[in-house]
A protein has these predicted regions:
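Non-catalytic, surface beta->alpha helical segment in thiol-disulfide oxidoreductase systems
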Residues: 97-136
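Bacterial N-terminal signal peptides that target proteins for export
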Residues: 1-6
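Thiol-based oxidoreductase modules, predominantly thioredoxin-like and allied folds used
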Residues: 62-79
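Typically the conserved alpha-helix immediately C-terminal to a functionally engaged Cys/Sec
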Residues: 46-61
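Bacterial N-terminal signal peptides
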Residues: 7-17
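Short, structured active-site "lid" loops
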Residues: 84-104
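Short pre-active-site segment immediately N-terminal to redox-active cysteine/selenocysteine motifs
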Residues: 39-42
Length: 145
């Protein structure tokens, strides 16, 4: 009986000892990263990201990743994208599709997105998540730039 009690106490101590270490290394499972994804019809790079990268990220992060997609198809939408980009520090020359915004971070193109998106999502989750970008505010802020 004494031996069983000792094993039980040691087991509880081990579990209690490992739990804080796991919490520090892991991410908050309730954290959510909201992203804005901009794409254009007929853009092969956009298709690549939409068909390959985003499904992989969704499979990896599940409900902790919410991606809102925005098609850029009209002149007004292109101008709005330029304004949003300007407010985030990008020039017109640096702006393009596909583009993903998470927090104040912007990834552009089919090279940046696959290589940097997983780390950006992980970092945002460790920081407690990322709110959806306020695109109206960003467009207004970038209108004067």
């Amino acid at each position: 009986m004494r031996r069983i009690l000792l094993v039980l106490i040691l087991s509880l101590l081990c579990l209690a000892g490992f739990q804080p270490a796991l919490a520090q290394q892991g991410t908050d499972v309730s954290a959510v990263v909201n992203a804005a994804f901009f794409w254009m019809e007929g853009c092969p790079y956009c298709e690549e990201v939409m068909q390959t990268v985003l499904p992989e990220m969704q499979a990896q992060f599940g409900d902790q990743l919410v991606v809102q997609s925005f098609e850029v198809g009209t002149t007004d939408e292109v101008n709005r994208l330029y304004q949003i980009s300007a407010s985030l520090g990008l020039s017109k020359e640096e702006t393009g599709v596909p583009m993903i915004i998470i927090g104040d971070q912007v990834l552009v193109g089919s090279e940046q997105i696959p290589t940097r998106l997983p780390g950006l999502i992980e970092a945002a989750l460790q920081d407690g998540g990322a709110e959806a970008p306020d695109l109206d505010r960003l467009a207004t802020a970038g209108a004067g730039a």
